Swiss-Prot record:
InterPro entries: GIY-YIG_endonuc (IPR000305), GIY-YIG_endonuc_sf (IPR035901), UPF0213_domain (IPR050190). This is UPF0213 protein lp_2058. Pfam families: GIY-YIG. Residues 15-92 form the GIY-YIG domain. Belongs to the UPF0213 family.
């Protein structure tokens, strides 16, 4: 007797990418990109992240905002756009997304 089996359900998770904003201890803002928010924040706070966040006076860093994307390109574009704004424009962007600093 032949056995019939159904194909296994796909367990492939959709990859997520994040654009995030950190508030530094010196009240400056840092925007970045990652595929793992918790790991990246821990790396920044350990002084092993981006050159900007390695400065001791900027730590600890606090995650104040993030956006989720299903493709890397969109997350990188969001990071690029944020980083090329003035501080006033960054604050306006965050305020429009209900982030209070």
């Amino acid at each position: 007797m032949a056995s019939t089996s159904k194909p296994a359900a796909s367990t492939t998770a959709i990859k997520k990418y994040y654009f995030y904003v950190l508030l530094c201890a010196d009240q400056t803002l840092y925007g970045g990109f990652t595929d793992n928010l918790q790991r990246r924040l821990a790396t920044h706070n350990a002084g092993k992240g981006a050159k900007y966040t390695r400065v001791r006076s900027r730590r600890p860093l606090q995650l104040i905002y993030h956006e989720t994307f299903t493709d890397k390109s969109s997350a990188l574009k969001a990071e690029y756009a944020f980083k090329h704004q003035s501080r006033a424009a960054k604050l306006k962007y965050l305020s429009a997304h209900d982030v209070k600093i």
